[in-house]
C-alpha cells in the first residue's frame, strides 16, 4: 500500500513539473490522458482559487493542471496551424481583443494577473476547437484535431464547406454570444444546448421545406444561412450539442428528405385527409386514385391526358383491362357497408370514364367526362358490364340501392348512345327515360338483370318495365312518384360521385363541378 501511495505521489509530482515546464516554454506537442477531452468547471475554479497554497494544488488541482496546460498546448499548436490560415488567425486576434470581459467571467471571477491571459486563450481555443468538428471523437491528441479542424477534413467532405463558411462569415456574430453561452453552460450544464440544437434542426427543416431542396448540398447551404441569421442561438450548442449534431446530423438530414418526398408526393392526400371524417374510408379512395394516376401516366404520356388527370379524367387503357377492372371494382366495393357505398359510386364512375376515353378520345368527349356523360361502347362490353353492375350491388343494403339505380341508369345510357348517340338521346338521359332501345339489346339485358335484382322492389319494377319494350308503359311506371324519385336519387348519386371524384384530384375544380351537378347533354 505504501509503495502504491508513493508511486501515485511521485507521478503527481512528475506531472506537475512537466506541466510547469511546458507552460513556461509555451508548450511542445504531446499527448494527454483521456480525461482531458472535457473541462470540468468546478475543478478549475478550485485550482485557480487555491494556487497560493502549494499543498492544496498538489492534492486537489493536479487533474485540473492538465486541463490548464492543455489549453496552452492547444494555443501553441493552433497558433502554428493558424499560420497556414491567415484569415482564421485574424479572427482569433480580434476575438481575444473584443471579449476581455467575457473571458474573465468564464473562470468564475477568481483570476488575477497572468491568469487573465490564460483565460482569454482558454475561452478562445474552446470555441475554435469545437468549430473544427472533432469533439465527437473524445479527442486525446490535440495535434490530430488541429490537422483536421481548421481545414474541415476530419468528419467528411460534406461538412467542410459549412465549417469554412462559418469561420469566414459567422465568426464575428458568434463571438458576441460566446461569452453568454459559456457562462450559461457553467451553471446549467448541457441542457440548454440540446434544446437549442433542437431549434436549429427544426429551423433547418422549415427552411428546407420552403426552398424545396432535397439534395444534401442545398441542405448544408441552408445550415450556413440559418447559422448566420441565428448565431446567438447556435453558439450555445458548440460544446455538447454540436457534438451530438455531428453524430446524428446525417440521420436527421435524410429523415428530412424522406418527409419532403412524402409531402410532395402526397400533397393532395394531405389536403383530403384533413377534410375526411368517416373512419378512413375516403383515404382508400385517394390511394386508389393515386395508383390509377400512375397507370394513366404509364399508358399515356400525352399532354391532353395529363390535363385530364388534373381534372379527374381517366386515361386510355385497353378494353380487356377496363372490362376486368370494372368487374373487380364493383365486386370488391359492393361487399362493404355504409361507408363503402360512396367508394363504389366513385370507382364506377372512374371505370366508365376510362371507357369513354377508350372509345372516344375527342375533345367533346373530354368535356363530357367532367359533365358525367357516358361514351359509346361495344355491345359485348355493355352486356358484360351490366351483368356485374346489377348482380353485385343488389347484395348491398339501403345505400346499395342508390348505387344500383345509378349503375342501371348509366348502363342504359351507354346503350342509348350506342344505338343513337344523338342530342335527343342525351336529353332523354337527363330525364331518366328508358325508351328507344332495340329489341335485341333490351331482351338480352332484361334476361340478365331480372334474376338477381328481385330482392329490391324498385329494381323489379324497372326490370319489368324495360322487358316490355313499349315506351308508353315505361313512362307510366316511371311517372308520378317513382319517376320523381328516380330522377332525384339518380341525380344525387351522380352529384356525390362527381363531387368526391373532384375532391380526390383537385380542390380548385369545385365550382366547375357544382355548376354541372345535373346531367348535361352534349
UniProtKB/Swiss-Prot annotation:
InterPro entries: Semenogelin (IPR008836). Residues 26-62, 132-158, 272-358, 379-522 are annotated as: Disordered. It is found in: Secreted. Residues 1-23 form the signal peptide. Residues 292-310, 336-345, 465-492, 499-522 have a biased composition (Basic and acidic residues). GO terms for cellular component: extracellular exosome. Keywords: Repeat, Secreted, Signal. GO terms for biological process: coagulation; negative regulation of flagellated sperm motility; sperm capacitation. Residues 31-40, 137-158, 325-335, 379-397, 427-436, 446-464 have a biased composition (Polar residues). Interacts with SERPINA5. Belongs to the semenogelin family. Participates in the formation of a gel matrix (sperm coagulum) entrapping the accessory gland secretions and ejaculated spermatozoa. This is Semenogelin-2. It comes from Hylobates klossii.
